Swiss-Prot record:
Organism: Colwellia psychrerythraea (strain 34H / ATCC BAA-681)
Family: Belongs to the bacterial ribosomal protein bL35 family.
Protein name: Large ribosomal subunit protein bL35
Originating gene: rpmI
Upper taxonomic lineage: Bacteria, Pseudomonadati, Pseudomonadota, Gammaproteobacteria, Alteromonadales
Gene3D superfamilies xrefs: 4.10.410.60
InterPro entries reported in the protein's UniProt record: Ribosomal_bL35 (IPR001706), Ribosomal_bL35-like (IPR021137), Ribosomal_bL35_CS (IPR018265), Ribosomal_bL35_sf (IPR037229)
Amino acid sequence: MPKMKTNKGAAKRFKKTASGYKFKQAGLRHILTKRRTKVKRHLRAKCMIAASDIKSVKKLLRHG
């Protein structure tokens, strides 16, 4: 049986914390002139994974 491998794309996107997994929101790369400052400020904040997605993220991050 081969070793279980971590999904490297997911490993770069999610970080394990004591209270769950955090990630950076999308939508802050380009075409930002039409967005309000408040929206851009809120997109800068890190978010936590929803409870319904934790099982799938754990499966992707086998060793993390």
